[in-house]
């Protein structure tokens, strides 16, 4: 027997074909959401408050300080928030201290700071009753970047940019004359030496001393001449910079100093953030700059005089490690003191080394490092600027390397916690201005924190983010896999990110650093391709937001692959050589072969086993969760695998789903972490279990109660239904499944079914990927799903009086009211068709001046005779089904309703949709198609069913027939392998796991096929169900996992006769949602013209479009059975005339005798009375009344 048994949870065992021993379990798949939000609550929020506060008034006599904050209990539970359309949020109370610096008086007070949405355990937020997800954003990391560019003459130039998290950009660039310039915040360029002089190093010799001799430095110094002898060089430089930043304003050295301090050196205005400081220090650190260079001077320990490294030594990694302590200490540190006119006058510490130029061995190049400022310094320092300039100048000497902006070491993730912190900071910054003004205006003695704090800007910023940000998205709730994928999504779009139109090919492309961090397969097709990605299965964020991936460490001394796990970011990985997970190992953990396949800085090649530093932990660490659910992924073309991964997320939850016979072993973990199942929180024993709740007694005697969700409407209109798995007496452990969610079976993801599939053509019905299906799948509800739609009706106060929910609806017969209760609301369980009343509602009509008789009737019969209009909620087209639930909200019951709304009724209708022609089906390999024919299953007698589908030698009919031509050109051979292995698994009565890149080999496949007693080619003879004759050739028949997708024909079918028209053009609206018509465009008109179908064309352009009076007349004629009158003038013709007149063209309409005709006269029919809309409505009401009277008299009889 090939393979080995593996248990997945307590309910499923699979035969696995994996050969690689995995030393690391998958992390919790939604930790990117939950951990980030927890960090925000624990420390992120505190940091934001500490960034903005304390706030002082303009005279610095009062100061508002932050003490701490606390979250109280949420107002609603999760379920209540869903029902009441409320947000699941907790009130936050912040303690402030107001200090009067003149009197020393301190007032401490707790201030309510609004309701803050709280993340659920599933990683989602409930906002206004809807479940939402904050998508993590992939952005360019703050830091310093270097790039090269080639001009039109082929000359290579260099550029550099310091990008902060918040603040002005500082750029450097070279031109064709080898002069180096700087730009501050995208303004006009100035020689870079001007900025150096402004920093207090004004002498030419001083500049050469810092940066060393180079053509770029000399050329720039010559360009940067002393223009005004009355100013010092530093003052002149400061004025020149001020002129660039504030052109037209009077320039002084002092104003320039304060401007530059605000731009770069003030931590409140300029923030690199922790990640920016880490990146700047890493890039400008002397150790990375010296690596592999030949040192041009003896390195001497200043204290002992010992020569650490002799001149001419190559600075390999081992040499640098041997003197690391000295490099981190004071080795070659120089202190430069700026002159008194400088922007910042503190001494500047730099680390300087001389190395041999890689281009010209006779030249010496100076390398300047920033001497590692403290991590807490968030603003730029003069040392950072000088070290950046040195790196930039060294690039022309062949030292250092330019950055790849698409490298994942330069792109980071802003997860939900950071996005919320940024939003909160925006709100607090708006509040700060407000607070400062109030502190200055009001009397200091009576001021309290409560009085000066207005929380509205903060709550508005948070509300706006959750409600309308591009990154706050309505959760994709088609099935648990789509929920999970949505939580792990990484978007490069959104505020501070890219835009679709400006994103080029490079940004979207797969990069070698994506390996183990971002999935190379799962991304949308269309305009967002490559901009929206998914986290790989083992991907994890470090504290700076860079994605790490785990590797097994290789002990270089013994050559053994250890079980020690090291998490590496993309730029850390660049320093090492990593072997693949499938490298063969001996028993003792050493490599079995001397040459192994590995990667180093994007090169995939063979390496000697002795140079390997790390080994992948798992073959599936490359791909995302949805991709890891595709068996035989290694046999599929990547384009089709992309479709397969995306289509699994569109699977509709079925009534009785089945887990796949051929899985990958990922189904259990995906279902477990998706948040759609009920998972045990503690160990214990089941003491009560039914369909709605499970009670578990813990070992310490306390009782846990788990509520099971039944048929709740999901975000995508499917039934969200959980099924209990445990029974009384079962012992459960923490993490066990208590109930399956939608699209799950026995604790595994189950998106579809396992039908018997044959690759063959049948009467041409499976042309172009169409799917032929047996009626058995319809009758036995194999692909039946339940869909829930929500309809609501509200009563408001109108100018003419309040609307009312009632059973007394004008002009409606008793038949239409049979399922309404005494209030006029449909009963639960009623079967409704389109047009049926769900909620009876009347709205008062404008009452005309009443005659004396009417007033008398009014006085006698009261409200009976008043004018009301029927505005009942009716079932829309395609909305028929069974009423599942009714919810009523009124002010009297204490429900929160919108202003002006008195009562709100919600009706939920459930539809059971069987599969039908036009529905879309798919496998897991991107093999999708539309059901084109459902082959009937007749019955000759009670005993012998007749099946037109082809059948196997044992009489089993085939369930689905697919077109064999869909396989070769698409290159997704995985489907054929799945087909054969699925048949073998069914025959053996087992389930199989074939993990991606480590699954069943072709030998395993054929061994299993033989074990199952199938023919050696895994094909079979098929018999024609209509004639009983065998087909000429043997056919590939097997079991394939097929899913029904959310693109159902019921949602797309649409027809219109009478409907709404656009207000301006008077043409019918478009689209199913607006109950619109079909657009008959220019080309369609040409087609009718070509056939000479003038009458058809005329009615399309008039009655059916925008001939307003014509269509009313036509309607009347049809209802009265009269001949249809001639059409009038379309509204669009009048628009054309008016537009031409507005251009000053004299356009008139003339009759045969050249007499001018008024356009409105054209509509006046010869003798026809025009029926206006009001008349039409009256006629309809009269007709309805007559119908009702007739039905009432019939009832009496």
UniProtKB/Swiss-Prot annotation:
Keywords: DNA-directed RNA polymerase, Nucleotidyltransferase, Transcription, Transferase. SUPFAM superfamilies: beta and beta-prime subunits of DNA dependent RNA-polymerase. It comes from the Bacteria. Its EC number is 2.7.7.6. It catalyses: RNA(n) + a ribonucleoside 5'-triphosphate = RNA(n+1) + diphosphate. Pfam families: RNA_pol_Rpb2_1, RNA_pol_Rpb2_2, RNA_pol_Rpb2_3, RNA_pol_Rpb2_45, RNA_pol_Rpb2_6, RNA_pol_Rpb2_7. GO terms for biological process: DNA-templated transcription. GO terms for molecular function: DNA binding; DNA-directed RNA polymerase activity; ribonucleoside binding. GO terms for cellular component: DNA-directed RNA polymerase complex. DNA-dependent RNA polymerase catalyzes the transcription of DNA into RNA using the four ribonucleoside triphosphates as substrates. Belongs to the RNA polymerase beta chain family. The RNAP catalytic core consists of 2 alpha, 1 beta, 1 beta' and 1 omega subunit. When a sigma factor is associated with the core the holoenzyme is formed, which can initiate transcription. This is DNA-directed RNA polymerase subunit beta. The lineage of its organism: Bacteria, Bacillati, Bacillota, Bacilli, Lactobacillales.
